[in-house]
Regions:
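Histidine-acidic metal/acid-base catalytic patches
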Residues: 2-10, 24-223
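Acidic/histidine-rich, metal-coordinating catalytic segments
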Residues: 14
């Protein structure tokens, strides 16, 4: 498969330490995925699904290592409480999402020159699917903006001095900053709605697709 990649294609290999069997028996962890990608070549990279880890896993450490090694290719963003729940990204632990995105920024994985792809891998079984996707994108945008606000020089000084509380204060200052107004201005400057959720609700699209949908109910696990 790798040998048959086109000139503008790459192979992105995800991992998971439990079900289904083709994950757990072949690519159970990020190290195995990394080893496969190194063996394949430069166009093979690791995909990190934020829900594919044991409770308590230091995901931001994995992000940092894969960026350092030049093998982080993509994210499948979601949240989890118990297993691979595929909940809205940032819903379970927004501070973890902030820490992950800060490592992405610090490690050079964010920006026009980066090949790291941001994707969503979620199941919206209770909330409506499109608003759930909009909320997910907004969460990633907001935490990325906060990660970009971290005073990296001050953080580096605190880290080198062994000042744990000082380093924490630098991160928390950025994390607690309300960036929603700035993001609204950023969207307006690009001809986009300042409030994407409000724009979707006002569009009437949800009501229209319900009226057109066979049976009147969206498809789900019971479909």
């Amino acid at each position: 498969m790798y040998r048959r990649l086109g000139a503008h294609q790459r192979l992105v290999l995800e991992y998971k330490f439990f079900e289904p069997a083709f994950y757990a028996t072949d690519v159970p962890d990020w190290g195995t995925s990394y080893a496969h990608c190194v063996a394949l070549g430069d166009r093979a990279v690791v995909c990190l699904d934020t829900g594919h880890h044991a409770p308590g896993t230091n995901i931001e450490f994995i992000v940092m290592q894969l960026l350092r090694l030049g093998k982080l290719g993509a994210f499948d963003f979601n949240s989890r409480f118990y297993a691979d729940d595929d909940l809205i990204v940032g819903a379970a632990d927004p501070f973890q999402l902030f820490r992950i995105l800060f490592e992405v920024v610090r490690g050079g994985g964010y920006g026009p020159d980066s090949d790291v792809t941001f994707m969503l891998d979620q199941c919206h079984n209770i909330e409506a699917k499109i608003p759930g996707q909009i909320r997910s994108v907004l969460n990633v945008q907001e935490m990325t903006a906060r990660a970009l606000l971290v005073d990296r020089a001050a953080l580096t000084d605190a880290e080198r001095a062994g000042d744990v509380l000082g380093a924490n204060a630098v991160l928390m200052d950025a994390f607690y900053t309300d960036v929603r107004g700035d993001l609204a201005d950023w969207r307006v400057a690009r001809g986009l709605p300042a409030d994407p959720m409000a724009a979707y609700r006002a569009s009437g699209y949800a009501e229209r697709i319900v009226a057109e949908r066979i049976g009147g109910a969206q498809a789900g696990w019971g479909a």
